[in-house]
């Protein structure tokens, strides 16, 4: 029995074409053109308490370099042009620390999209975290870290940073 598979062109302005679907590094650059302005980054919302890690305060980022079928973060990933507002690292840190203090959290993060978009913004945010009592959980799919060794090494200098790499699956159960 032969199963015919229709080849789908996944390319659009937010998803550069690639022979096997899309190129996550090209998609990183495309996403950054939408969600980064200088040292400012787009967020859908700031500082919400979550139960993960025994309690964490998280900001919801906009933009990603993957297009996972089972992703729960639909609008911030698929419609970054019309989602969120731009915030400076100081604004994000202030909102996170205020909410974290209210809930007694020592962990803060920015999640629900790709955490490594906007390196300047990320590094400035991590410098603020390093001078604080908090630990920042960087949630990433790891594509940019694997592609750019210097970026990964630069992250290693931050003492209050925990990097969590999320390995994606090929079906809903694995994801």
Map each language-model feature to its residues:
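N-terminal [4Fe-4S]-dependent radical SAM core
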Residues: 2-65, 69, 73-80
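Short linear motifs at secondary-structure transitions and domain/linker junctions
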Residues: 31-38, 85-86, 137-142
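Conserved active-site and cofactor/substrate-binding residues in soluble primary-metabolism enzymes
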Residues: 59, 87, 120
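"Short basic amphipathic alpha-helical interaction patches in structured regions
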Residues: 73-76, 85, 123
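Conserved AdoMet/S-adenosylmethionine-binding subsite of the radical SAM
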Residues: 93-107, 111-175
């Amino acid at each position: 029995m032969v199963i015919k598979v229709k080849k789908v062109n996944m390319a659009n302005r937010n998803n550069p074409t690639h022979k096997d679907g899309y190129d996550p590094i090209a998609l990183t650059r495309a996403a950054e053109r939408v969600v980064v302005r200088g040292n400012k980054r787009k967020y859908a919302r700031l500082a919400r308490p979550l139960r993960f890690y025994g309690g964490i305060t998280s900001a919801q980022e906009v933009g990603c370099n993957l297009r996972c079928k089972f992703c729960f973060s639909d609008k911030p990933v698929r419609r970054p042009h019309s989602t969120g507002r731009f915030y400076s690292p100081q604004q994000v840190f202030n909102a996170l620390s205020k909410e974290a203090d209210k809930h007694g959290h020592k962990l803060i993060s920015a999640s629900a999209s790709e955490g490594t978009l906007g390196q300047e913004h990320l590094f400035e945010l991590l410098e603020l975290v390093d001078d604080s009592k908090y630990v920042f959980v960087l949630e990433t799919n790891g594509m940019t870290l694997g592609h750019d060794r210097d970026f990964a090494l630069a992250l290693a200098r931050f003492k209050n940073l925990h990097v969590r790499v999320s390995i994606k699956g090929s079906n809903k159960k694995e994801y």
